């Protein structure tokens, strides 16, 4: 409803100037690694009863992505866990199918910290931007392997891999 009202008022992506600019739509898919609320594809290694806390069911995330694309807005989503990132990628794929011609929108994942090899490959294939937050490395690198296990930790924080694969990765 809020997005529809915003659009009815005449606001559009790219409007504005130096101090005010209408940018992409940003949502959250999960929480944080430290609080064990980042959504993982497997149980937390140090808390097997937890897999994270998804913010939206997949159907809702798909709807929000398609709604963004219909409005001409890039869809960017906070996703720290690998399952959250996969969910965002599923939503982007859904929106691009539902709203043809929107592949040029600069959809993205904010954080993109815990990733599997499959997730990295999908990001590269879809050309989704990554808004990395390297400031969290100082804390997360001390807990990453304990939280997600050695195998998943090895393919996480793989921003250089994404850069080498042609993905636009920014710090911020």
Annotate each language-model stretch with its function.
Residues 1-82, 86, 122-129, 134-135:
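Metal-coordinating catalytic core of metallo-dependent amide/deamination hydrolases
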Residues 14-15, 95-104:
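Short helix-capping segments at alpha-helix termini
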Residues 76-80, 107-113:
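Catalytic beta/alpha-barrel core
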Residues 83-98:
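Short, electropositive alpha-helical surface patch
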Residues 67-76, 100-106, 166-170:
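Short, surface-exposed connector motifs at secondary-structure boundaries
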Residues 10-12, 93-96, 127, 147-150:
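Short, hinge-like loop/turn segments at secondary-structure boundaries
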Residues 41-57, 108, 143-155:
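Glycine-rich tight-turn/loop motif centered on a GG-T
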Residues 114-172:
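Active-site-adjacent C-terminal substructures of enzyme catalytic domains
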């Amino acid at each position: 409803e809020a997005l529809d009202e915003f659009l009815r008022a005449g606001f559009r992506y790219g409007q504005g100037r130096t101090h005010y600019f209408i940018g992409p739509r940003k949502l959250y898919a999960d929480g944080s690694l430290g609080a064990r609320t980042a959504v993982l594809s497997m149980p937390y290694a140090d808390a097997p009863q937890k897999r994270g806390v998804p913010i939206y069911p997949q159907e809702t995330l798909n709807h929000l992505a398609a709604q963004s694309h219909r409005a001409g807005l890039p869809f960017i989503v906070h996703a720290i866990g690998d399952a959250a990132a996969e969910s965002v990628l599923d939503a982007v794929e859904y929106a691009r199918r539902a709203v043809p011609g929107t592949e040029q929108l600069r959809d993205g994942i904010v954080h993109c910290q815990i990733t599997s090899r499959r997730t990295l490959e999908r990001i590269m294939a879809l050309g989704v931007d990554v808004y990395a937050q390297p400031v969290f490395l100082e804390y997360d690198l001390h807990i990453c392997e304990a939280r997600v296990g050695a195998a998943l930790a090895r393919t996480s924080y793989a921003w250089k891999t994404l850069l080498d694969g042609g993905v636009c990765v920014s710090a911020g």
